[in-house]
Regions:
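Sec-dependent N-terminal signal peptides
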Residues: 4-13
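Patatin-like phospholipase
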Residues: 18-97, 105-372
Length: 372
C-alpha cells in the first residue's frame, strides 16, 4: 500500500511540474513582453541621445527662434530680437505663426529690426486696422462691431443665397506682403533663405498643423494670418488653410523637427479671459482660445528658453502702444539674459537687405495670379 501511495505522489508531482512547463501564454503576458521591449528600446535611445549630447561642441549647437501669433502685440517680438542681436546670438532656424510668421519671415530674409518695425506699421495702419487682421486677440463680439465688418450675402441668378467664407477678404494684404517680399518671390524652398524658415497654418479640413517649407511665401503668410470667421480661408494645393494659432500658436515642435538643438520661444499669445455674458461669436472665440492655450502649454514646456512678454493688458487693436510692446519684449528677454548668454554666438554679421525708404511706397501690379 505504501508503494502505491508513493507512486501516486511521484506521479502527481511530475504532472504539476509538467503542467507548469506547458502553461499557455496569456494576453497579459504578451502585453508585458511588448512593454518591456519598448522600455528597452527607449532606454537604449536615451543612452544614445545622452552620448550625442555629451559629444557635441557648444558652438556647434543649432538654435531656433520661435515666434507666436498675437496680432499687433507682435511688436513685442522686436524687443526680443534686439536683445538677441545685442548678445550676438546665432539663429539657425526660425518658425512662426500668424504675426510671428511675418516677423520671422522678414528677419529670415535679412530685414533689419528697424525695417521690420516699419513693415508692421504699414500692415497695421494701412491694412490690418482696416481689414481686421490685427484683432487676433480681440473677442469676436468686439470684432463684430467694427465698422468694416458688414456681413454680406451672395445671390446667384436663381436667387439662391450663400454666406461668405469670412467677413473680410485678404487680397489687399496679400498684395502688400507680395510687394514686401518681391526680391524673394523666385525662392520657393524656405530652406534656401539666409535663415531656414517654417510658416505655420492650420488645415481647415483636418485640423492638423501644417509647417510650410516651400511655396508662394506671400500666400502662405496670408494663410497663417487668416483668422477664422474674420478672413476668408486660403486654398493652397487643394487644401484649405486658416490661422496657425488654431492648431499651433507656438511652433516649438516644428523647430526641433528642423534640426534645432536649442529653442528660444517668444510667446505673446492671448490668455483665457473670463466673461460674464456670452453670445455665439464670443463662444466661438473662447473655444478657439482655450484650444490654443492647451496646445501652447505643452509647447512652452518644450522650449529651452521661454520668453513671455507681459502684453495681456495692452489692447490688441491699439497700435499707439507699439513702443510699450517693444519695450515689454525687451524686458521679458532681459529676464532670461543669464540663459541667453549661454547660447552659441554668431561668427559673422547678419546680412541686411536694402532698407525701406518710404513706408508709403507706391507700387504697380501688372498681373495678379491668386488661385482660389
Amino acid at each position: 500500500m505504501k508503494k502505491i501511495f508513493f507512486l501516486i505522489y511521484i506521479f502527481l508531482n511530475f504532472s504539476f511540474a509538467y503542467s507548469e512547463n506547458i502553461e499557455l501564454k496569456s494576453r497579459e503576458d504578451v502585453e508585458i513582453e511588448n512593454i518591456e521591449s519598448q522600455i528597452k528600446v527607449l532606454e537604449d535611445k536615451i543612452q544614445t541621445i545622452k552620448k550625442l549630447k555629451n559629444n557635441k561642441n557648444k558652438d556647434d549647437l543649432k538654435v531656433a527662434l520661435v515666434l507666436s501669433g498675437g496680432g499687433i502685440k507682435g511688436y513685442a517680438h522686436l524687443g526680443v530680437l534686439r536683445v538677441l542681436e545685442r548678445e550676438n546670438i546665432k539663429i539657425d532656424y526660425i518658425t512662426g505663426t500668424s504675426i510671428g510668421a511675418l516677423v520671422g519671415t522678414l528677419y529670415s530674409i535679412g530685414y533689419s529690426i528697424d525695417d521690420i518695425e516699419k513693415v508692421l506699421d504699414i500692415i497695421n495702419v494701412e491694412n490690418f486696422l482696416e481689414t481686421g487682421s490685427d484683432t487676433t486677440n480681440l473677442p469676436l463680439d468686439k470684432k463684430e462691431s467694427l465698422k468694416k465688418y458688414s456681413l454680406y450675402v451672395n445671390f446667384d441668378n436663381e436667387l439662391n443665397f450663400s454666406l461668405p467664407k469670412g467677413l473680410k477678404g485678404n487680397r489687399e494684404t496679400y498684395l502688400v506682403v507680395k510687394n514686401l517680399l518681391k526680391n524673394y518671390a523666385n525662392i520657393k524652398n524656405f530652406d534656401d533663405f539666409p535663415i531656414p524658415l517654417r510658416i505655420i497654418a492650420t488645415n481647415l479640413n483636418t485640423g492638423e498643423t501644417k509647417a510650410f517649407s516651400k511655396g508662394d511665401i506671400s500666400k502662405i503668410l496670408i494663410a497663417s494670418m487668416a483668422i477664422p470667421t474674420i478672413f476668408e480661408p486660403v486654398e493652397i494645393d487643394g487644401n484649405t488653410y486658416v490661422d496657425g494659432l488654431v492648431s499651433r500658436n507656438l511652433p516649438v515642435e516644428e523647430a526641433y523637427d528642423m534640426g534645432a538643438d536649442l529653442v528660444v520661444a517668444s510667446d505673446i499669445g492671448a490668455p483665457i479671459v473670463k466673461k460674464d455674458n456670452y453670445n455665439i461669436l464670443s463662444v466661438l472665440n473662447q473655444i478657439s482660445t482655450i484650444q490654443s492655450s492647451n496646445i501652447t502649454k505643452v509647447s512652452r514646456e518644450k522650449a529651452s528658453i521661454l520668453i513671455s512678454p507681459d502684453v495681456k493688458d495692452i489692447s490688441a487693436i491699439d497700435s499707439s502702444k507699439k513702443n510699450d510692446l517693444i519695450n515689454l519684449g525687451k524686458v521679458a528677454a532681459e529676464q532670461q539674459i543669464a540663459k541667453i548668454k549661454e547660447l552659441p554666438k554668431s561668427s559673422s554679421n547678419r546680412k541686411i537687405v536694402k532698407n525701406i525708404e518710404d513706408k508709403k511706397e507706391k507700387f504697380v501690379i501688372n498681373k495678379i495670379e491668386y488661385n482660389k
